Amino acid sequence: MAGLYEDAFVEQLRQGLVATAHEWGLPPHASITTLNLSENATFKAVDPETGHPVILRVHRPGYHSRTEIESELAWIHALRRDGIVTTPKPLPCGNGDAIAVMQAAGAARRVVAFEFMSGAKPDAQAESIVPAFRELGAISARLHAHARAWQRPAEFRRKVWNYEAMLGSRPLWGDWRDALGLTADGRATLERACRVLDEKLTRYGEGPERFGLVHADLRLDNLLVDGDRLGVIDFDDCGFSWFMYDFAAAVSFFEEDPIVPALQDAWVEGYRTVAPLAEEDVAFLPTFILLRRILLTAWIASHAETPTAQALGSAFTDMTIQLADAYLTQAERSLANQQG
């Protein structure tokens, strides 16, 4: 993974795209620049003659299978066809294939293309963030209703984001115990929090009314605001998980911000304009927030070379421990009140 964030490696990927751009009708002299480096590498290609931009996503080898990528694209096509959400159109290659394969940095790498979508990510500090979350709640409800009703292709395959895949015995994003700056006391707090999360989620269950196909990464970086339109991008993490997990993903990296309760209220309000939402589901939102936060702590631990991890450092781990401690304290109070 370390090579993904070195300039020389990124340049090899870019050169690979230069040689592959013809698959989408782009000329060899198209301008190709880096947009984002995370699980994958995302680039923006612009035809200098037309000025038309295309988004190119280079997949990390060994993470998603071809079938998983095709499944993501199948859901996006269905969502667009059914008018569920504004999201960029996947662009097939000239031969009709959904996925191109390029050789770069000594490996075959899958590439998919999308239309460019205008807009800017919501600002968590702006007054507009609350109405944006109200709209996001409505979008989430539509996504969840579609996921429940959609007849998936027989070969549809996406990862399952349950407790075991997040924090349990087969973590997809690494082990939070390797977190930057984690102390013995901090580890004990998180171990205790994980036990409580596991117990609560087991009781909550994975029935079809609570668990299904979700975007799973509706954080601010994957939302684009343009006027009154709130668009959703990057379905790369979509998979099977709890529907309420989508709210937790939306407050990624700022879970401790005092505005989160107001955002939760707005999200729930927006959700209920589209579909019913039980109070028990709402009551579980703090559980999913902590689940996501510890998962992000694991991701940072396993991606310590990334710009995100380096910017957040051990302070992110410290805040995760504080959030876990506050969650445990609240859980103890709730239990005492029930027993009293």
Feature locations, PLM:
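ATP-binding pocket architecture of kinase catalytic cores
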Residues: 46-152
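ATP/Mg2+ or Mg2+-diphosphate-binding catalytic cores
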Residues: 2-5, 296-340
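Juxta-kinase regulatory segment immediately upstream of eukaryotic protein kinase catalytic domains
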Residues: 1-31
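Active-site acidic catalytic loop and adjacent metal/ATP-binding pocket
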Residues: 36-51, 55-56, 90, 195-244
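A cross-family kinase active-site recognition segment
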Residues: 94, 123-185, 209-211, 318
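An alpha-helical support segment within catalytic cores of ATP-dependent transferases
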Residues: 13-22, 148-154, 167-215, 336
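Active-site activation/catalytic loop segments of kinase-like enzymes and analogous catalytic loops
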Residues: 243-276, 292-308
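A glycine-centered beta->alpha junction motif in the catalytic cores
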Residues: 61, 96, 111-125, 171-181, ...
